[in-house]
Amino acid sequence: MNAPDSRQRMITVGRLHGAFGVRGEVKLESFTDPLRSIARYQPWILRDARGIEHACEGVRVREGGKGLIATMPGIEDKDAADALRGTEVLVPRSALP
């Protein structure tokens, strides 16, 4: 994960809700329509509760359970996935249609 370019206008497209299983997958709430289109808008900028932002590329999204599940580079266990609970997913406005 890298630091984002703060000069771009960012749009919130989702939120992470903690671990799904024990392999580092993360429950994902998408604000896009259709819901799965959130995967097309990358890189994601992840903003935690303290307002700290990190860029994340190569995220894979699938349907699972009662919603979407994200697999993110560098998140490989339940503890790392749970640490992302409440994190907002943002993308540059320029990435949207």
Predicted features along the sequence, with ranges:
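Short Lys/Arg-rich amphipathic alpha-helical segments
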Residues: 1-97
